[in-house]
Amino acid sequence: MFLQIAACFTVIGLLYGLVSNLQQNRRLAASLPPGPPGHWLFGNVPPKNFPFIRFAELTEIYGPVFTLRFGRRIVCVVGRHQAAVDILVKHSAETTDRPRAIAASEMLSQGFRILMTPAGERLKKYRRAFHTCLQPSAAATYKPIQYNHAKNYILDCLHDGKCHLEHGRRYAASVVMYIGYGKTTPTSYSDPEVQEVNKCLGRLSEVIKPGAYLVDTYPILKHIPGYASHLWRYGREELALYTRQANAVRKQLEKDEAQPSFAAYLIENQERLGLSNDELAYLSGAIFGAGSDTTAAAIAVMTMAAACYPETQARVQAQLDEVVGSDRAPTFEDEEMLPEVTAFVLEVYRWRPVSAGGVPHRSTKDIVWNGYVIPKGTEIIGNLWAIGRDPELFPDAEEFRPQRWLNENGRIRDDLKYPVFGFGRRVCVGQHVADQSLFINTALALWAFKISQDPAKPIDVLAFTDTANIRPLPFTLRFEPRVKDIEAVLEAHLD
Ligand code: HEM
């Protein structure tokens, strides 16, 4: 008898939940931006592949902001520049938060990973710590090391152009290992330490894919013993790895042998910054996670664009020849005089944005936009792929056309922006370091080489990995030296 009554109450409870859920959905739907219809209970089906491309198609149909529903989760996708500014920049204070990511953040990262840290005290202290080491004046101090590694990239491409993607990855890994841990020697992707970090990042990349784990739709699963227990194990392994790396710097500091680095700064200021050992370990590791593959992918896109758009490449080279010539190599000091290089980089960012789908934000208050209400708790995706294809700002968006970034005087336009580094208070903390990397590698690569395709292996400009941060699938390039004795000229500069 008792069991029957309990069952009755459970069924009534479930029905009540269902009905109130439906009523809530109907109420919300009336004020939300429009979107494709979905199942009355489960909502829309997340795209299986390349969600940013599917979302860009939906932007064409439903407009600058459209709504999707996944179970109880409401997602607004922003696909036009002005709407992104209105919602994610002007309302930055209310959109700093991240959506709850149970599998990727709470289980795999034990809540420590900055990328998924919700708005609040932990995020504030994380970003404060980064700001000190990555703001423009601090970023400028990394220029010499970036230059040295960029020079290695050029020499690697000269001697072994087949492995150009690996050389770009080596550049990026070397720079972030220097900033993160003070490692001064070049870092190879085959280093066991880097391989271990990459194993962890590869796992994250799988777990973070929309719809990868049911627990993100049904949070109760987190508490079911045995459910996705490998995620907890992976999380423990990752924390142990970052702790080992931070402890190595701690030991160097004790022996007075440490190079200046982000980890050293965190350790020396741990108490003042209010960081636990685990937070400190994860934060030091974040530089590699966030800055390595992204930078390498952008460098790869730069070479891809140069090979596929030879006339555009030649335009940059004409300016390099005029300003720099061939007796010396370009340096950071030439930047002001090389707007064609900067325009090329800006177009690389727009044409194939590395963080193509953007990193989701979450509203912590109702936001009124264009007569619609984006309610508190909505996930907001700034779809960078679609924003870079905004026809009002970027006509013929599929064309790689750096000239769109230049004004009639050949200077960089200050009225055109593209948010490749994200939005508002969540904007990428490494943007200045990344800009420096892209500038110097582009300037040196286009000064040193005529980069072209192998006619026998034409490049597919849409062949990219289907991952949270996209990167080109392997492609073949030819590096034809434009400067006599590149090696000697580069060495002379360093002497
Ligand atoms: C071309 C290279 C890069 C691109 C395209 C890029 C892009 C991005 C984007 C789109 C975000 C998310 C912003 C948002 O939520 O709106 C982000 C976050 C982040 N980036 Fe970068 N990034 C690059 C390089 C770097 C580098 C070199 C570092 C470190 C030295 C770095 C560190 C971070 C960190 C720590 C975050 C998380 C910030 C947070 O969640 O509060 N990134 N980046």
From Swiss-Prot:
Keywords: Heme, Iron, Membrane, Metal-binding, Monooxygenase, Oxidoreductase, Transmembrane, Transmembrane helix
Residues given in the record as heme binding sites: C428
Transmembrane among keywords: yes
CDD domains for the chain: CYP64-like
GO MF, one annotated term: monooxygenase activity
Membrane-spanning intervals of the chain: 2-22
Pfam families on file: p450
Any one Gene Ontology cellular component term annotated for this protein: membrane
Subcellular location: Membrane
Pathway terms, separated by semicolons: Secondary metabolite biosynthesis
Class of enzymatic activity (EC top level): oxidoreductase
Main localization (coarse): membrane
Membrane topology: Single-pass membrane protein
Cofactors (names): heme
Enzyme Commission number(s) of this protein: 1.-.-.-
Keyword Iron in record: yes
Record InterPro entries: Cyt_P450, Cyt_P450_CS, Cyt_P450_E_grp-I, Cyt_P450_sf, Cytochrome_P450_fung
PANTHER family: P450, PUTATIVE (EUROFUNG)-RELATED, P450, PUTATIVE (EUROFUNG)-RELATED-RELATED
Family to which the UniProt record says this protein belongs: Belongs to the cytochrome P450 family.
Function: Cytochrome P450 monooxygenase that is able to use 4-ethoxybenzoic acid as a substrate for oxidation.
Name of protein: Cytochrome P450 monooxygenase 113
